[in-house]
Amino acid sequence: MSGGGLLLPGTQAAATETTPPADYQADTRPDRIGRIIVPVRVNGQGPFQFLLDTGANRTVLTPRLVERLGLQVSHDDTVSMSGVTGALVVPTVWVERISAGDLVLENQRLPVAYALGNDVDGVLGVDGFANRRVLVDFVHHKVEIRTSRSVVALPNVKRARTYFKFGLLMITPGTVGRVRVNAVIDTGSEHTLGNRALHDALHLQEEANQSDMTEVIGQTLAKQLGARHQVQNVIVADTQTKLVNVVFGDFYMFKLWELDKEPTLVVGMDLMGALDALVIDYGRKEVQFQTHKLWNRPITLQTGRVARATVPSVPDPTAPAALPTSRATNPPLSAM
């Protein structure tokens, strides 16, 4: 995704080099549906609760937060927002400063959009993560955002080199069974999603049982059906997951990303939430998985959370962009 997104003529969306205290370490938590919630300050106020979403190319404010801050919404300066199932035009708002640790955005016109769920104030997208390193410690419920080369590497991690597409959309090689895949690292997606090309490469049955059909609702409220299948031996960053429930479909964002023709897996929080720690290093172009409990042996997961919050992203004028986060309306896949 583009870090700039779709902006008004003459505007720029780039992280400033203003340096806040380097040792930013704040409480975070995977909430009850598995999302990573972090404290963010807006125009010096807060902190407010933002969803950390590496699948969103822009930082987004909810109408509730905009009203609370007394900001002026522009319905003339709109942007096109793309989600997992479709696109929608949304208004924007001018924000002087957003900060979270060593991430600072200044003088930005940002999208304003509702989330499917009313418990977050906004979305911290990747528009400020250039040359930054994000550490999520799931054991101690901490998140750290610092400059990429200012920290010592974690011990006992498995690393994978990544590449960027459309800005800072992070992709790493992986495998599902014997099929090589593009693995998109997306902390904003509760479910792991697969495209049609991966479905066919795995030779999965054409029609899933009715109970396995999942209705996916994106931020635009457009709906698409996906088929839920259990797949074996998913390997990302040299970490193997033995059994994974994946929702497959011709989802809108795969085509926007130009990943609809190649087997692609969106790695959601149902997988990453099982780690001890996750490091996403945009400066070094790598992802790190820390798995003390799971070291050198397969892990078995079942995606049991029903995703209900979707965070929008907005496309760049010259490059497609989308956010894979989705809401699945079928019952939970396992009792929790």
Task: Label each residue range with its predicted role.
Residues S2-M336:
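Pepsin/retropepsin-fold aspartyl endopeptidases
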